[in-house]
């Protein structure tokens, strides 16, 4: 629940978010809001996301209202590809939470860390509800900033024994290898085709605009969490793979327009009705995986309600701990 403004504007910085919100808190918040969305108790507003034709940046807004949790707000931010050269994260964002009873700005929360951990929580929720319980090999496609968050969150969902990984820049793979070693998991850098042959669960977390995985490379029973496609034109996997899989998503409206399903839907090979909100599985309204041979795919487009959910948790914990700043507007 968003804090009230009677004591001024609450400000929770990036450092506090990292101290207060862990993987368990993020998982619970994201799973809860996905369930609320499927019940119709929470909804996202239309996304605004634009190439601003400056610094090669993408900038936009994601917002929504969770009536069940009484969380109202907006995340503002985007992607600046040159930031890492200046020691900054390429992803930059801030979350604004409003008092739903009055409309007053209540809380300002740093969104960079929370974006990474809520994205990882989303794929983790999909793994928990859709992957085979006997999954042993985790495949990672992408080794950027968010990849280590993804690996840590995924590793908590199944008894994985090995991580296989591919990245277009193989010199970045050691960051994943270090985390795998820390978690006691065998690590192997492989080709894309070999990754598909070995992995029981695959996470794609890239900014690709062409398929990195082809349908014929994926073995029966695999669960894929496609987490990088959040803009029109982006694509991480072959559209034929999307068509052959049982597809779940965070938000169907986004999946078919800016998500991994956009290409299959755009060609007429997949209908909107064939895509299921993962909240329906969480709520027990859909069985999820139907067999050990079924290929399941989670199209994680990233919705504003995820950001608001984890930001609300950060605000509550910071207020309880007395570690947030308060200012009067």
Task: For the regions a language model picked out, list residue spans one by one.
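Adenosine-phosphate binding glycine-rich loop
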Residues: 14-17, 235-329
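Residues in the short beta-alpha loop(s) of Rossmann-like NAD(P)-binding domains
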Residues: 144, 168-169, 230
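Conserved beta-strand elements of the Class I
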Residues: 138-139, 296
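Rossmann-like adenosine-cofactor binding region
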Residues: 185-269
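Nucleotide donor/acceptor-binding cores
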Residues: 134-136, 161, 222
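Short internal alpha-helix immediately C-terminal to a glycine-rich phosphate-binding loop
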Residues: 118-138, 145-157
């Amino acid at each position: 629940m968003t804090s009230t403004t009677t004591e001024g504007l609450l400000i929770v910085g990036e450092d506090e978010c990292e101290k207060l919100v862990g993987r368990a808190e993020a998982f619970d918040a994201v799973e809860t809001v996905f369930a609320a969305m499927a019940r119709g108790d929470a909804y996202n507003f239309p996304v605004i996301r634009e190439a601003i034709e400056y610094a090669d940046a993408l900038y936009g807004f994601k917002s929504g209202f969770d009536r069940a949790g009484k969380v109202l707000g907006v995340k503002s931010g985007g992607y600046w590809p040159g930031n890492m050269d200046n020691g900054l994260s390429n992803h930059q964002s801030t979350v604004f939470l409003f008092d739903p009873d009055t409309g007053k700005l209540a809380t300002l929360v740093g969104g960079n860390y929370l974006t990474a951990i809520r994205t990882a929580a989303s794929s983790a929720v999909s793994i928990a509800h859709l992957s085979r319980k006997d999954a042993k090999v985790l495949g990672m496609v992408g080794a950027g900033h968010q990849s280590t968050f993804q690996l840590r969150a995924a590793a908590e969902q199944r008894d994985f024994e090995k991580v296989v990984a591919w990245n277009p820049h193989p010199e970045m793979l050691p960051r994943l290898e270090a985390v795998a070693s820390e978690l006691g998991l065998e690590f192997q850098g492989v080709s894309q085709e070999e990754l598909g042959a070995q992995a029981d669960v695959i996470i794609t977390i890239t900014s690709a605009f062409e398929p990195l995985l082809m349908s014929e490379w994926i073995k029966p029973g695999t669960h894929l969490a496609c987490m990088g496609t959040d803009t029109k034109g982006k694509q991480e996997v072959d559209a034929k793979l999307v068509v052959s899989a049982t597809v779940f998503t965070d938000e169907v409206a986004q999946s078919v327009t800016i998500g991994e399903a956009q290409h299959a839907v755009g060609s007429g090979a997949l209908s909107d009705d064939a895509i299921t909100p993962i909240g329906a599985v969480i709520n027990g309204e859909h069985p999820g995986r139907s067999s050990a041979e079924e290929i399941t795919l989670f199209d994680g487009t990233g919705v504003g309600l995820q950001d608001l959910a984890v930001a609300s948790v950060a605000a509550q914990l910071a207020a309880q701990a007395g570690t947030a700043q308060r200012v009067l507007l």
